[in-house]
């Protein structure tokens, strides 16, 4: 069995302002950095990250001294016209209202479709799993984005829930396991051990 920790990056200024932060490569905010320094994730054998700064910085704080493997396909969604804006700033935008009315199923204007985003993330996740199997890694961490985690869990979790119900807070995520032999034979499933409640990992 391979154990994976799917961890959402720490908080950024854009997160604090409820902005759609996808391709915008902003760093962690001070609050996010301070919060992560209080957390205590287990040691792992490999760390895989999105190429965006907020994920790389989070990995460096949570797993100091561990080399990180950049997986381009694990990056967050390209929100196109909505990028780096919040719902208040998008009020009155007809494209935004159409997207809301579609329950988030329409492609982001000038950005990615849900299907394209998910397909890209799953390719990246398959690369991670293949790397773990090839290198005999028994426990690894993925420091990625909220949307990326939701795509992976919606597709592979042994508990059936829709995309938005897999949402996690900054610094939180999921502990999952997979059987590498079943995975190699096409039976791709993640056993959900627990949701990572970020507050339970804080040093007192």
Question: Residue locations for each model-derived region?
Answer:
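A polyampholytic, Gly/Pro-enriched intrinsically disordered region
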Residues: 87-100, 183-198
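Generic beta-sheet signal
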Residues: 4, 45, 136-146
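Conserved small/polar residues in nucleotide/adenosyl-binding loops
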Residues: 202-204
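Glycine-rich phosphate-binding loop signature in dinucleotide/nucleotide-binding domains
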Residues: 41-43, 128-138
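Short beta-strand scaffold positions
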Residues: 49-50, 119, 143-144
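Active-site-proximal alpha-helix that buttresses catalytic centers in soluble enzyme cores
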Residues: 2-66
């Amino acid at each position: 069995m391979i154990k994976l920790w799917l961890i959402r990056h720490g908080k950024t200024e854009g997160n604090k302002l409820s902005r759609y932060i996808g391709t915008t490569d902003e760093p962690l905010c001070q609050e996010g950095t301070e919060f992560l320094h209080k957390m205590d994730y287990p040691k792992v054998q490999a760390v895989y990250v999105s190429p965006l700064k907020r994920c790389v910085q989070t990995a460096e704080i949570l797993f100091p001294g561990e080399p990180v493997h950049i997986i381009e396909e694990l990056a967050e969604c390209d929100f196109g016209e909505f990028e780096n804006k919040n719902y208040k700033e998008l009020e009155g935008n007809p494209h935004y209202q159409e997207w809301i009315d579609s329950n988030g199923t329409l492609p982001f204007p000038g950005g990615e479709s849900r299907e394209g985003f998910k397909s890209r993330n799953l390719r990246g996740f398959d690369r991670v799993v293949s790397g773990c199997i090839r290198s005999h890694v028994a426990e690894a961490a993925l420091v990625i984005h909220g949307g990326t985690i939701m795509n992976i869990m919606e597709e592979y979790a042994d508990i059936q829930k829709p995309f938005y119900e897999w949402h996690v807070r900054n610094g939180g995520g999921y502990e999952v396991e997979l059987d590498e032999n079943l995975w190699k034979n096409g039976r791709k499933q993640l056993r959900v051990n627990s949701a990572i409640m970020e507050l339970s990992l804080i040093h007192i």
